[in-house]
Design a protein with these regions (language model features):
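Sec-dependent signal peptide recognition
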Residues: 1-8
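N-terminal signal peptide c-region/cleavage motif recognized by signal peptidases
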Residues: 12-17
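Hydrophobic face of amphipathic alpha-helices that form TPR/SEL1-like repeat modules
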Residues: 19-25, 41, 52-59, 63, ...
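Short helix-capping/linker turns of helical repeat alpha-solenoids
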Residues: 43-47, 59-61, 66, 79-83, ...
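TPR/TPR-like (Sel1-like) alpha-helical repeat modules
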Residues: 102-109
Length: 109
């Protein structure tokens, strides 16, 4: 029973701390370190981490700017209901960056 208590209450706070640490690193301009903090959380399905990685690829922060990868990370996060990522996906559909062509129908859905 105590084991479940630990899993339910402490594991999410550890992940939240990793995301906040990554944001602090991004604000300090340490993008490579931020990516190293974010990648494990994103691979385990954390929508905030996925959205931040999308931002890094979209803006070329610590990685080579890549609209296709940015769109993929935004899309993963948006499928989990992340509002910032949903906005990013809509923008990519509207402008058509990272896609074969703009898709205004999907952009405004």
């Amino acid at each position: 029973m105590l084991r479940y208590f630990f899993i339910i209450f402490f594991i999410p706070s550890i992940v939240f701390a990793e995301i906040e640490n990554a944001r602090d690193l991004m604000e300090a301009g340490k993008f490579q370190e931020a990516m190293e903090e974010l990648m494990p959380a994103a691979r385990s399905g954390n929508a905030d981490a996925e959205e931040l990685i999308g931002i890094m690829y979209a803006m070329g922060l610590g990685v080579e700017q890549d609209d296709v990868r940015a769109f993929e990370w935004y899309l993963r996060s948006s499928m989990k209901g992340h509002p910032g990522a949903q906005s990013g996906v809509g923008w990519y559909y509207e402008i058509g960056r990272g896609l074969p062509a703009p898709d205004l129908v999907r952009a405004y859905m």
